[in-house]
Amino acid sequence: MPRRRVSMGAYTDYSPALMTDMYEYTMLDACLKDGTADRKCVFEVFTRHLPEGRRYGVVAGTGRILDALEHFHLSEGDLKFLSDRKVVSPETIKWLENFRFSGTIKGYREGEMFFPNSPILQVEGTFGECTLLETLILSVLNYDSAVASAASRMVSAAKDRPCMDMGGRRTNEWAAVAAARAAVVGGFKGTANLLAAQIYGLKAIGTAAHCFTLVHDDERQAFRSQIAALGENTTLLVDTYNIEEAVKTAVEVAGPQLGGVRIDSGDLASLAQRVRNQLDALGATNTKITVTNDLDEYALAALQTAPVDSYGVGTMLVTGSGAPTCAMVYKLTEREGADGVMTPVAKKSKNKATVPGRKLAFRSYEYNLADCEHIISGSEKALAAYQPNPEWKNLLVDYVDHGTIDPQYQGHDAIMAAHEYRAKALAELPITAQSLMKGEPVIPTETTVL
Amino acid sequence: MPRRRVSMGAYTDYSPALMTDMYEYTMLDACLKDGTADRKCVFEVFTRHLPEGRRYGVVAGTGRILDALEHFHLSEGDLKFLSDRKVVSPETIKWLENFRFSGTIKGYREGEMFFPNSPILQVEGTFGECTLLETLILSVLNYDSAVASAASRMVSAAKDRPCMDMGGRRTNEWAAVAAARAAVVGGFKGTANLLAAQIYGLKAIGTAAHCFTLVHDDERQAFRSQIAALGENTTLLVDTYNIEEAVKTAVEVAGPQLGGVRIDSGDLASLAQRVRNQLDALGATNTKITVTNDLDEYALAALQTAPVDSYGVGTMLVTGSGAPTCAMVYKLTEREGADGVMTPVAKKSKNKATVPGRKLAFRSYEYNLADCEHIISGSEKALAAYQPNPEWKNLLVDYVDHGTIDPQYQGHDAIMAAHEYRAKALAELPITAQSLMKGEPVIPTETTVL
């Protein structure tokens, strides 16, 4: 697959610069007036907790943030809108005219595991430029990581059987594209979504719908038509009327070389067993069985002993299997004071207090298995002097250096690298991570304030 | 607000034509080869059940489908992609070159209540053109209606207090735009999302974030700055450090004309009560109190007696408050046979069987309250001869007539009309609809097959 540079068409007419909450612009306006907009700042993205009972999360979406950053500038239409609605003052409009993010971004890799308080993304720049990114960064990371985290659990539950994204119809049409990408980061092997396949170079997969059988005069004609168009290696949908008859017809029409059959209703385990035996008896021993129908990780685990070859997962994938968002937040942790010195800051809101200071993040291992997430916080000076254990894994990579994006984290190759990385990082966690039993995060997070 | 025609920039480079599952195109390919692609068809969108315990759903998104239809044609890039990936044959590429939907669409209004089996959308055209729309139509209706349905419950629970969408950061960045629109259909009064405000002409609202207080040397300077930029009618965030001190500072800085304060943490009801008393004691009797912090319809109901003036709702709005999708499906119900006669069809899949034949839909009333949803199904001829009770409300309106879109259902005015319509339609349901207790749909759906 050739490496594809992504240029989100969505951002051509509507830039991501207005994919934001109004208060980001009104705060910018006030801070430009009083001079604090130029203060150097560090913002960090983290979540206070994983969804109930989850053992780990999987980071996804960072590459999409980089794509969006490339287009994060205001069009004439955007400026006119902000001006007409009096969202900001004319002076701020002027400031926004040539806006480009010129800061630095570090963070966890896509496909990396995360835990409560992991500093998933760290954005450093002036207050003005960092605050404008808040909503967009959170939208991307909260949704994509929710999908990747659910996908990863499903892939574990499916053991070595491939999982395919078929969930586009059950979420917003653009979320569907992001979900397909995040599913692959989370371990899925392909997607039914053509736009995701086009934009990100993903493998596209598909079978047929019940309407295809119904529009034909009978099932035999439908199967004949599909094989004529797609070849005998196609997958025929066999549960429109009567599964046993459909399987018989399918093998009669395609011959024993038939690629596969799909079952989309009923008791999937016992139906798969019956269909497998029937296919074998008909000589179609290499014909694959794929099943679909509101699958989640628990259903996949229950199907482990059934003779199924692959899974199509829809609703529960794109809605994060009960956790459709990650509760990630974007918080100011350090800023320049009136004296020009960088100072750790934190809010003290009840149950929502934050840890002041920028963070370093490492993972330690014992017998090749992760045993702790170490978050080190402190002043710029203290962190510069800090010597981590050399055997720890440094979890922060450099995404953007003073406005320059590292392209290795964008496009198709980055997604496939994240796909591989997830499998490796998951294998390095205690095996309890792969349990579907509800429990605590599989490793503790220790925060050290220097 | 001037009426805005919507031209989704997202569709300029990436047309909605690839926001679809691959099998729609492979089915088209097979059907073009065997001649069934030209068969006249009727597809219908419905859900088999509401989310557990919900009394009704609210339709939203149909106007966005019309926007997408205007752009539903394949660019050269799209055709090249389908060709390079060998998704379809060269003959099908040719057919797709000038593709425009030329069929007819009827359906429920946006803002209308729906129940199990309500035919929310009815798409009539050739098999080829109708099948290509499946995924996109479902993506839009499933997500937008999930948000509008949750919004409607929240608005009921909030009584007359305005609810504002602040959820953009907790869902995909484009889903956020759709969610803001759907929230207004569902009864919300405004959104923090600027792009939604721009595209759909919605009211934009906002306060300030904790980082705004933190970037300043102290809270007093932050409040001064915000008032200098936005005037004393602005809303100050008072829970960064200590709420009581912040309220005192706020009134000192702004004077008793201060527009509002926002509380985002802790026990909102008791804090609102304390803050109200403090504000009144300081003479700021007209200063409003807005609260935020993972609100859902249950939290809003619990706040009914607290002195709160408005609500900012985030996560639970954009994730459908536990039901992030509506389980709507798009099923072939009638098609032309080899003999040219329209014939009702249905699949017989276990637990997923469908009712054959196109549907009419009416709601009947007793003492001005809805008492039944009537779904009438049958052959084209039987339906043409059918005489409904003249007192029933006909639930299907004409959206598209042979490819021509009725513009009254697009843009800002259509959203505001849907907003009004929802309030009226909800008031016509038995009051149990507004209960948050789990239960059955508030009126039964009766299906009659002629």
Predicted regions and their residues:
Chain A
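Gly/Ser/Thr/Ala-enriched C-terminal appendages of enzymes
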Residues: P2-R39, E52-R54, L282, T287, ...
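A residue-level signal for beta-strand positions that form part of recognition/binding surfaces
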Residues: V42-E44, S102, C163, V329, ...
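An N-terminal, globular interaction/scaffold subdomain
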Residues: L66-F72, G107-E110, F114
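Short coil/turn segments at secondary-structure boundaries
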Residues: K80-F81, S149-R153, G167, Q434-P441
